[in-house]
């Protein structure tokens, strides 16, 4: 029985059933489609740099990208994510809030249907956002819907801390919901060199599980310790290979 419960097929099926059940009970969508990101990026009218061209070319692969600040890693990561479900992982709330604002400005209209922020103070961020939005007619209703879609991982793009998502590696009751969602998502890990040892440990373990479940991973960092690269690329039963590039 334990072998069945721990199998990837079981995790995905149970997780998707839980996700559908949550959505039906809350009268919400299971997923809000990402059909806007590539168009928003194209509207920037930028001439893409080498790092960005590399991510476009290798969009269907798992990536490890090392590059200094100012190379355009953010745009590169979003071009890799394309019009898919995206989780953008950063280590600090300040960095997450800044990335949330950056993506929100990129996608412009109806941001509350496109990009979410997920950390310990999500409610404060949203209340402040909606309070400053003069177009909102029913602030309480708008907040509840936005917050609910965020917590149930229904948003197209979610910028989050690793602890909000990768706690699923500890296999608490109902953990399959998150892992099943990751199985069809693009996971962007930014600045992995800044993670504390404990967070780094369970992040690497989560990455390996997500990879085995079918999710895609792209890691963008200024520096990468050799032991971290070894742990990330160490083969498990069906783990896909990474394309590594140092810019």
Predicted regions and their residues:
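N-terminal helicase ATP-binding lobe
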Residues: 1-247
């Amino acid at each position: 029985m334990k072998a069945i419960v721990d199998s990837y097929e079981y995790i995905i099926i149970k997780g998707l059933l839980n996700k559908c059940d949550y959505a039906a009970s809350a009268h919400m969508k299971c997923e809000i489609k990402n059909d806007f990101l590539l168009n928003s990026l194209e509207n920037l009218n930028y001439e893409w740099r080498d790092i960005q061209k590399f991510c476009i070319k290798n969009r269907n692969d798992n990536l490890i990208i090392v590059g200094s600040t100012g190379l355009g890693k953010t745009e590169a990561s979003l071009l890799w994510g394309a019009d898919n479900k995206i989780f953008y992982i950063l280590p600090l709330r300040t960095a997450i809030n800044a990335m949330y604002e950056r993506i929100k400005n990129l996608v412009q209209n109806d941001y509350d249907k496109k990009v979410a922020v997920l950390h310990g103070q999500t409610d404060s961020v949203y209340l402040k956002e909606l309070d400053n939005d003069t177009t909102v007619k029913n602030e309480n209703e708008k907040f509840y819907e936005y917050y609910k879609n965020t917590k149930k991982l229904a948003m197209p793009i979610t910028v989050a801390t690793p602890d909000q998502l990768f706690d699923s590696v500890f296999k608490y009751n109902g953990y399959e919901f998150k892992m099943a969602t990751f199985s069809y998502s693009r996971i962007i890990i930014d600045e992995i060199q800044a993670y504390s040892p404990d967070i780094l440990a369970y992040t690497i373990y989560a990455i390996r599980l997500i990879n085995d479940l079918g999710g895609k991973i792209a890691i963008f960092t200024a520096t990468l310790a050799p032991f971290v690269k070894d742990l990330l690329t160490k083969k498990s039963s069906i783990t896909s290979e990474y394309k590594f590039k140092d810019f």
